[in-house]
Amino acid sequence: AMELKKRGQLAEAIGEFRELIARNPGYIPTYLMAGNTLAESGDRAGALAVLHQGITAARAAGDAHALGELESAAAALEG
């Protein structure tokens, strides 16, 4: 997914990120990468939705570092 993003294939990268989240919802960094890619593609609402899913997952996992990053990314889009 990151390789697709680097090549500018954002729609394809987003599809891959969504698959990765579906297969491994406990891997928190994917939510941030997906949210950033959605925001880059112009889908602010989609980005916020994924970031908020990640915030929920990070809280459940007790991952304070990832939670902070996700909350910061969401706040930047909301602000």
Residue ranges of each PLM-predicted region?
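Structural marker of alpha-solenoid helical repeat scaffolds
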Residues: 23, 57-61
